[in-house]
Every structure is written in C-alpha cells, then in structure tokens.
Amino acid sequence: MMTTAMATTRVRLGSEQLLTSGMLKNKRVGIVSNPASIDAKFQHIVRVLAETPEVGLAAIFGPQHGFRADVQDNMIETAHASDPSRGVPVYSLYSETREPTAEMLKGLDALVVDLQDVGSRIYTFIYTMANCLRAGRKHGVPVIVTDRPNPIGGDTVSGPTLVKGFESFVGQFPIPMRHGMTIGELARFFNDTGGIGADLTVVPMEGWQRGMYYEDTGLPWVMPSPNVPTVESAVVYPGTVLFEGTNVSEGRGTTRPFELIGAPWVDAEALAEKLRTYDLPGVHFRPVVFEPTFQKHARQACGGCQIHVLDRREFRAVESAVAVLVEIRTQNPSAFQWRQPPYEYEHDKMPFDILAGSSQLRHQIEAGLPVRTIYYSWLQDHERFHIERQPFLLY
C-alpha cells in the first residue's frame, strides 16, 4: 500500500522554518492550532512559542473540534476559554465566531496559522484559515501560514468541483474534492483568486515533494481531527465523506472511520460481489459487518464493505465511493435516503449537494448514469484547475 520508500531525510516544516527565521522576534503573536500542530520531535507550536523569550504569545485560536480536538462531530461548537498555565485566551473559531474579531486581534503584530490539512475540499480547517485571512485584512494584522504536507500528495486532483451558489463552511472556493495542494499553497490561492488581499506570508517547507504521501515525509502523524486517525483515513476521505450526506454510516463510531461503509439493511456479500464487477483500480471492497458505538446506526450491526486501498497512485477515492453509494442505493431503494438539512449551518440546501459542491452528482446518480460516465464528467474541470492553481504552487 505504500507508494514510495520511506524518506531517508525528513521534511522540515514551515513552523520549524518560522521559529528559526527571527520573523517573530519582539512580536505579539496569535496562533491558530490544534494537537496536530507539532514538529518532528512532537513539540507543540504553542509550547515552543510560549518558551521563546523574544516572542510574546498573546492569544490561541482553535478550529473545528476545538484547540484540543476533543469534540467529535459537525455542528457541535466549542466555547471560548483560557489557558491558565500561560495566561492567554483560547478563542474558538467553530462557534458563533468563525472569523477572529477586532477585539480578539487587538494588539497582535501577527496571526500565525499552523494547521494540518487532509487534502479534501470539505475539510473545514482551510476555511478557518481563509477566515483568518479575511480578518487580518479587515483589522490590519499580517497573517503567517506555516506550511505542512498534504498527507495524500500534491499530484492528484479528483472529484467534482464546487459550483457557485453551493458555498458553505465545507466549501468556499471552486476547487475539486481532492485539490492536491498544501495549506500554504491554498492560502496563496484563496488570498488571490478569492480577492481577500490579506498581508500574507507563507513559510514553506524544506524537502517536500508533490509525490509524497505523509509516510514519506519522515514526520510523525498526529490525527488532525477525531475521525481522521490515520493516513489511510485521509486517503479514502475525499470520497467516503460523501456518505455524510446519506443515511448510510461512513464508519464514525468505529476504529476505521471513512474506511467502513454500511447500514443495518445492507447485504455485505451482495454489495461486495457487485462492486468487484466495476474493476476499479487500486482498491478491494471486502464485505464486513460492523457496529458503530455512536452516530448513525449506533449499537446496530451494519452490513457493508471496508475499502482496502491496494495502490494509492491508482486508487480513485471519489469514483470508488460513488460506486459504493450507487450500489447501496440500487440494492436498497426503499431504505436508502439522502440526508435532509440542516448540515453545517445550511438550512436549505441538501447536505449531499453541499458536500459534492453542487446538485449535479446527486442528479447523475438518481438518473442512473454509469459511474465511469460520472467520473469522466469531472475531467474538464480538473484540467482547468491544474492551470488555475499553477501560479500558487510552491513545490
């Protein structure tokens, strides 16, 4: 399943570059981070900043799931708090406040964003970053984004592209489901093409290459959110996250979120047998029965499949997930349902459409279009995006 040999020399993170650059000397700094904001020695950036005498740590900001990443699900907000050991406020940016306010930024010389993305359009951390850029522009605070690896690589672009009118907190910009960019590259892309215009500095990594998966970087993996515990979760996530828009479990409440897909009314053997006829590259669908401990179908035995990625470079996460969805819907027409609003604070649009970036994919599935035809319908947008993103790539 590994795509290349493990790195013999590790990638040097943007946060490590920042802390040795002197850029923060004699500055009052705010930091947007969570438990994955560590360096190669597992040192957290908040601790390092707090222990650096020439840097004044003045505020901490947390994204979705909280600064401690202890909150499980979507639309469960975290409250503002304080860090008694450091005497600084801890502001939640997944609450009634999504964008830092003037009061939160008061007195700051810079706002640093050090977040680990997972490589999918719908992951909210990149929009928390975008909101920080907007706040920095409004209130005259420079924003520094310390770059981190895209854990699923920077070469592949896949899945449907967000269409205007379907923006939400899981999609603010017209990018494909799997965008193949680092968080620093996305900052540059959003700031320019989104017309934000913040005073932005991206501190690049050293040694990262676009073909790398996270294991190739030589860096320790810390789960950026509760339901992306492993790199394997991140690899399948751009596709199987679509099941959040249905009444089928995406494996939350199990030890394999986004790899296990199913529901109490799914025949696991029949599903896997049919999926094998698709002959999709780089993947095996194994029939399983699992019991989620929470969320959809909690404490119920669910039939379904586990998605085993055999070759990451051949695997097509979104096409594979659409195939699973199509077959579950076809085999269980009376039981399968599209999830109804609200979802991520959108009260009118269908949750599946918000995730997919438009209503097109849902309509294609309902019309019975072949999965391969659906896949080919994305390719023109991918070609355009490759051209659009090129000026903003750092590696």
What are these regions (language model features)?
Residues 9-55:
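N-terminal phosphate-binding or glycine-rich loops at protein starts, especially the Walker A/P-loop
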Residues 56-65, 146:
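Short internal beta-strands
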Residues 69-73, 144-166:
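Glycine-rich, charge-decorated loop segments at or immediately adjacent to ligand/cofactor-binding or catalytic sites
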Residues 73-108, 120:
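Glycine-rich oxoanion-binding loops at beta->alpha junctions
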Residues 117-129:
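Glycine/threonine-rich flexible loop motifs
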Residues 166-240:
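Conserved anion/nucleotide-ligand pocket segment
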Residues 208-293:
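Glycine-rich, aromatic-lined ligand/substrate-binding cores of catalytic
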Residues 262-375:
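Conserved functional hotspot residues or short segments at active or partner-binding sites
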